[in-house]
């Protein structure tokens, strides 16, 4: 036997292994390329190279199918096809002066309409300018869809204009983030995003649209091959790759697809949990309900919830978007001395209310009270639990649905009237004291409490209030009374300044017949005063910005409003006796289609003494 045979066999075996590894790697690479380029899909689905249709049309069709009536934007080339297509389908496109305003407006529409609010911004800075507004929507649990443009897929990571990793920015802020990879993916991705935004605990979602997904085939082809002339072997390979790339973008693009809304799933209290709460409430002598913003969410109409609360007859404290739920002068609505009431209460229902800073992290609740907590979000449901407070019953479910079920199960229940009237009497005494404080002159300028009482006296029943500011707005929450359900908008737990302009825009579109007021602080006004330009421009077709803005500042902001095409008035100590007359004048100008800014100089009071402004 030849002694070299084992060595030769070993070498041959090694070569075979190397060849197998090489073939395996080559096969994997080819399969990866085939998958990336959708080569198998392209075998069965045609590309219509002559079609002038574009991805923006599909976006508009999906939005229309989901009942979207308004789209807010600051336009840019990356997203122009969406804007054009939406206008053609009758979706109102409203352009703002800042991208954050566009998201705030979408947020307001979501809250007031019960559907998703939509904002569309161009790539890079256009998208990054929305981060604060999207975080605000997340913390306010508002279903907002942000559509952002981006660089073409082929150019990502290669130094294209305004090309950044946008998805990484929004993953911590959004329930769902996605980048669309082909025209055929537009409908399923958007349907999924909109459903996720509204299911369980609502929140914002972000969908990125690369440039080459939105424009027609012939334009994308022209841009891809604009600088390509090579006819070498490598050039032919590159040409094949690029052709396959474009083919994948448009393969099956215009085939029929389902555009209808996907089902929205909501957590609900079980019958056993409701019965457990029935037993607690039926034995209660001093029950209290604290309602938070979650109770205004679909599917329960706010009118049905209001009827439910009135039938239960349990005294209520209202916070956030729930302000106004019981109207202006309900005997069940307790506005003052919440801390003292909670010390006495034997059963407290936290209906969509969170034990965060607004309830002293739960420390405001008595350890003797039986606590029923209801919230869609488990983390919020148990925030600070077993530290400063302890839930007797914790229900992960929709708060409004729970209250309706509780009322149905408590037929014949009557809350002790001495408890209700006692709380209301304390309320009356406190409000009388506030009115007395309002009559005390300040060292300079106007007493803000008196100003707010004047405003409250003149607000019509269809008015809608937007709170955008710090101390002044906190005072307004005690003095000014929202007229009904969903007539008060504030930023929510994030406490964002600058929501006013966007909220007003969205609110006026949803409620064109309402008188919309922004209660501004001087700092918050600075964030959105340029939106007076937006209000003026868009009143041409709908007279939508019939809003009054009440701000407190030392600068001539009323002159700025005039410069932007609106109306402006100054109210100070010199014309204090004309306060109600000026408010009526502002209202009259609004009815004639003019946005109005009432610039009021106010002095200091001790109304919020002891509060820390942070």
Predicted features along the sequence, with ranges:
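Thiamine diphosphate
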Residues: 147, 155-164, 302, 339-344, ...
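Glycine-rich, acidic loop regions that bind phosphate or pyrophosphate groups
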Residues: 4, 17-25, 148-190, 208-215, ...
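Phosphate/pyrophosphate-binding active-site segments
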Residues: 39-47, 220-225, 231-268, 274-275, ...
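Glycine-rich, anion-gripping cofactor-binding loops and their flanking helix/strand elements
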Residues: 8, 111, 290-380, 482-514, ...
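A short, small-residue-rich loop immediately preceding and capping a beta-strand
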Residues: 69-73, 92-94, 112-151, 290, ...
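Active-site diphosphate/adenylate-binding microenvironment
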Residues: 56, 77, 82-84, 426-513
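Terminal signal-anchor or tail-anchor transmembrane helices
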Residues: 4-42
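Glycine-rich phosphate/diphosphate-binding loops that line cofactor/substrate pockets in enzymes
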Residues: 27-39, 58-68, 108-113, 196-201, ...
């Amino acid at each position: 036997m030849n002694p070299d045979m084992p060595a030769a066999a070993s070498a041959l075996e090694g070569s075979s292994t190397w060849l197998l590894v090489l073939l395996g790697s080559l096969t994997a690479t080819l399969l990866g390329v085939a998958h990336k380029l959708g080569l198998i899909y392209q075998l069965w689905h045609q590309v219509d190279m002559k079609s002038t249709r574009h991805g923006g049309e599909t976006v508009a069709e999906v939005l229309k199918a989901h009942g979207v009536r308004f789209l807010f934007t600051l336009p840019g080339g990356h997203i122009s096809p969406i804007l054009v297509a939406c206008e053609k389908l009758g979706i109102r496109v409203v352009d703002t002066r800042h991208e954050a305003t566009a998201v705030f407006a979408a947020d307001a529409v979501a809250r007031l309409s019960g559907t998703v609010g939509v904002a569309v911004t161009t790539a890079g800075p256009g998208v990054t300018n929305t981060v604060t507004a999207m975080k605000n929507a997340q913390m306010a649990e508002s279903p907002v869809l942000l559509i952002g443009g981006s660089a073409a897929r082929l150019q990502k990571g290669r130094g294209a204009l305004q090309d950044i990793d946008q998805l990484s920015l929004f993953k911590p802020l959004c329930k769902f983030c996605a980048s669309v990879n082909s025209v055929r993916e537009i409908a399923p991705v958007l349907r999924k995003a909109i459903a996720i935004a509204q299911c369980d605990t609502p929140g914002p979602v972000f969908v990125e649209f690369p440039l080459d997904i939105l424009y027609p085939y012939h334009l994308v082809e022209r841009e891809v091959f604009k600088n390509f002339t090579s006819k070498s072997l490598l050039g032919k390979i590159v040409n094949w790759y690029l052709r396959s790339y474009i083919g994948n973008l448009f393969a099956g693009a215009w085939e029929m697809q389902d555009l209808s809304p996907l089902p929205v799933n909501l957590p609900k209290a079980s019958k056993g949990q409701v019965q457990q709460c029935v037993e607690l409430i039926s034995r209660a002598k001093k029950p209290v309900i604290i309602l938070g913003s979650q109770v205004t969410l679909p599917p329960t109409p706010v009118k049905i919830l209001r009827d439910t609360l009135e039938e239960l007859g349990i005294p209520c404290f209202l916070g956030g978007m729930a302000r106004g739920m019981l109207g202006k002068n309900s005997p069940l609505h307790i506005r003052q001395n919440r801390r003292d009431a909670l010390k006495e209460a034997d059963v407290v229902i936290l209906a969509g209310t969170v034990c965060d800073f607004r309830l002293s992290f739960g420390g405001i609740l008595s350890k003797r009270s039986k606590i029923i907590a209801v919230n869609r979000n488990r983390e919020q449901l148990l925030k600070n639990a077993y530290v400063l407070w302890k839930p007797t019953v914790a229900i992960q479910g929709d708060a409004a649905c729970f209250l309706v079920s509780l009322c149905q199960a408590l037929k014949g229940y009557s809350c002790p009237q001495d408890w209700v009237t006692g709380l209301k009497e304390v309320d009356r005494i406190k409000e009388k004291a506030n009115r007395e404080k309002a009559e005390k002159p300040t060292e300079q300028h106007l007493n803000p409490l008196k100003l707010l009482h004047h405003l409250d006296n003149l607000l019509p029943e269809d008015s809608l209030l937007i709170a955008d500011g710090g101390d002044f707005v906190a005072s307004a929450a005690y003095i000014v009374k929202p007229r009904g359900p969903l007539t008060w908008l504030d930023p929510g737990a994030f406490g964002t300044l600058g929501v006013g302009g966007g909220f007003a825009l969205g609110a006026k579109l949803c409620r064109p017949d309402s008188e919309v007021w922004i209660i501004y602080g001087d700092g918050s006004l600075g964030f959105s005063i340029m939106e007076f330009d937006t209000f003026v421009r868009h009143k041409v077709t709908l007279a939508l910005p019939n809003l009054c803005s009440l701000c407190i500042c030392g600068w001539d902001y009323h002159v700025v409003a005039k410069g932007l095409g609106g109306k402006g008035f100054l109210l100070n100590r010199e014309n204090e006796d004309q306060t109600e007359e000026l408010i009526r004048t502002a209202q009259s100008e609004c009815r004639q289609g003019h946005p109005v800014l009432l610039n009021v100089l106010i002095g200091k009071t001790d109304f919020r003494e002891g509060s820390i402004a942070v």
